[in-house]
Design a protein with these regions (language model features):
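Active-site palm subdomain of RNA-directed nucleic acid polymerases
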Residues: 191-203, 227-228
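Short, charged alpha-helical motifs in flexible N/C-terminal segments and linkers
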Residues: 1-57, 88-148, 227-228
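Short coil/turn segments at secondary-structure boundaries
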Residues: 23, 49-50, 74, 168-170, ...
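Short, conserved non-catalytic motifs in the polymerase core
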Residues: 33-47, 84-90, 99-121, 153-179, ...
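Cytochrome P450 catalytic core segment centered on helix I
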Residues: 51-53, 61-76, 80-84
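Short, residue-level hotspots on alpha-helical faces of the histone-fold
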Residues: 57, 61, 123, 127, ...
């Protein structure tokens, strides 16, 4: 856990000097720890309940709307691109090897969620816990059976700048249980096979081999050509 918290590449720096990594982890924790916030009136708040009110108020307004729009008419104009063959592929039951493959593709030391375990734990002890985890994931994917707390998350606030003061200087990040991430990864792997066929050629994200910077380069070249 100390290695995970320190965010240091152990393969390059070794793992013998534990005091060094403890100091790194402590420094990082102190830098990211939220001990105060500035409210909308510019007043510093150090009480935990006051900071909680600021966070709930800000993100509550951010992720809600006072003018909801009905998208049903808009969706009627969207032409379906998923063929019958694609649909048969998507609804085909998941199998155990897809669960194992999804776990192998996960970064070992991602921050843990409510389960308290990084993917490395499951990867290392798969011979022991693999059967139980596989059954849990397949029951969810194929039959919609989810155990209690399956999709619970821990929401942590990550600083967007070096010295955050306001709640706007933080972005929320959801930390999910590993089993839940395995299920979502398995679904994503299945979608990869049909995404190139249903996503526009002008969409430069989500499809393997396309870069989000491609559209930026196209826009730059277009403006350069117009200005000539």
């Amino acid at each position: 856990m100390c290695r995970q918290r320190s965010r240091i590449n152990w393969f390059q720096n070794g793992d013998r000097n534990t005091s060094f990594f403890h100091a790194k982890a402590s420094t990082r924790h102190k830098k990211n720890f939220m001990d105060s916030l500035v409210d909308d009136d510019g007043v510093w708040k150090i009480e935990e309940d006051k900071m909680e009110e600021i966070a709930i108020g800000y993100f509550g307004d951010l992720f809600s709307t006072s003018n909801p729009i009905d998208f049903s008419n808009l969706l009627l104009a969207v032409q379906p691109k998923v063929t019958q063959e694609m649909n048969e592929w998507l609804v085909w039951p998941f199998v155990a090897c897809e669960v194992t493959e999804a776990l192998k593709q996960m970064y070992p030391l991602k921050a843990p969620g409510p389960d308290g375990m990084p993917p490395l734990f499951f990867q290392h002890f798969w011979s022991t816990c693999g059967a139980v985890v596989t059954k849990m994931v397949l029951d969810f994917l194929n039959f919609g059976i989810s155990p209690c707390n399956f999709n619970e998350t821990h929401i942590t606030l990550v600083p967007k700048i070096k010295e955050p003061k306001k709640i706007t200087d933080y972005r929320p990040n959801s930390l999910c249980n590993v089993v839940y991430k395995i299920a979502s990864k398995a679904i994503a792997n299945g979608l990869k096979k049909i995404l190139p066929s249903i996503i526009s050629d002008t969409q430069s994200a989500f499809v393997h081999g396309r870069l989000i910077t491609d559209n930026v380069l196209v826009a730059f070249e277009t403006m350069h050509h117009i200005s000539q």
